[in-house]
């Protein structure tokens, strides 16, 4: 008879042998496939802990906690001296690259071979906020989710500037015009919550006119911050125990559930003949995304997952883009004046979508803001099968690299957008004029590319452009009132830790 201690020792020995055998098999498979596919070796990060890579995890976590995640990435790549390298992240192989060719391959040629569901749904990082939806799933479920939302990001949706006018006026009416300092960032968060809630749910939150509703906007900010922390923690996510975060998640879920319940009830009333309708499927003229969804899905959990997968990531994108543009414009008064001259040249003309798109310098400002302050810092995907990427291997980094099933690839937009090889020696400088003679193609991908490009990319740029147009029309000058440099605090995307403290004078 074996004792309990002997059973325990035997189990430990078996586990070690299994792990070693699995490691040896993976290495054999890796080198065999690497050779067969004509791939070169990738540079290795020099670890102090080669087994789990805890040294790498520690430096990453420290940078994240100190709000140095963006400069840390620049320092990390500079220390490697290459644009593609691999590191050990808690025992898993992680590939880090800032090569545009690799970004292109992951987004187009091999896009089905790279997924995100195991990272967002499988890991539980997005739970309990977002269920299955367009930004959390792969395969047939992604096809279904994409088809549900696609009609709402067509020209009819993003070219309707009239729906923005009332919200933009409310926003700008809250801006002090006596030259006093104010923070534009929280105002824009409230503005976007109001516009997006009407677009997605058919009813605005009205946080700009009813300050008591601001708690939803604040809860959204904290919810997105928590999701980013959980995604970054990866396998250590089980250590994330934040009761305040859960309270904010509940506020957001309750907000969404209330609108789902009301829409499901309204649908039943229409079907039973109790509800009034302007058209067969649009009671009271509803044309919002949720109303279309409830006609295809009546399961509350499924509806919440689908709408949350749009509501959560979109809540950061537009407001932060405008915030960053105003931050940059305040520090470059000549750019602000050039932009204002272009806008004022329109005179009293009606601002249509076509006229908005025709404002060249405004487009340059939007692009330059995307370039220096991309909302999506990196595109992270997990290999769903063995595959390759076109560059990063061999002594000169020009050979393809082998990506093994389960490898996690971090394609870094932030570094790509600030690379002097792509943008010249002034790559770190805010200079909208550069867009008059550059055609960056895959070196500039603020919304990604290929089939999984952000479906709202035209809508985001249109809304941001319209707000900036109205802003420069109304305010003659824009001054910075905070000399501290930009310091990113990470949510889904980065926002300025110090806010956007400025002052304006009216025209």
Swiss-Prot record:
Heme binds at residue 454. This is Cytochrome P450 monooxygenase lepH. CDD domains: CYP52. Keywords: Glycoprotein, Heme, Iron, Metal-binding, Monooxygenase, Oxidoreductase, Signal. It comes from Aspergillus flavus (strain ATCC 200026 / FGSC A1120 / IAM 13836 / NRRL 3357 / JCM 12722 / SRRC 167). InterPro entries: Cyt_P450, Cyt_P450_CS, Cyt_P450_E_CYP52_ascomycetes, Cyt_P450_E_CYP52_fungi, Cyt_P450_E_grp-II, Cyt_P450_sf. The gene is lepH. Its cofactor is heme. Disruption phenotype: Leads to the accumulation of pre-leporin C at the expense of leporins B and C. Glycans are attached at residues 315, 367.
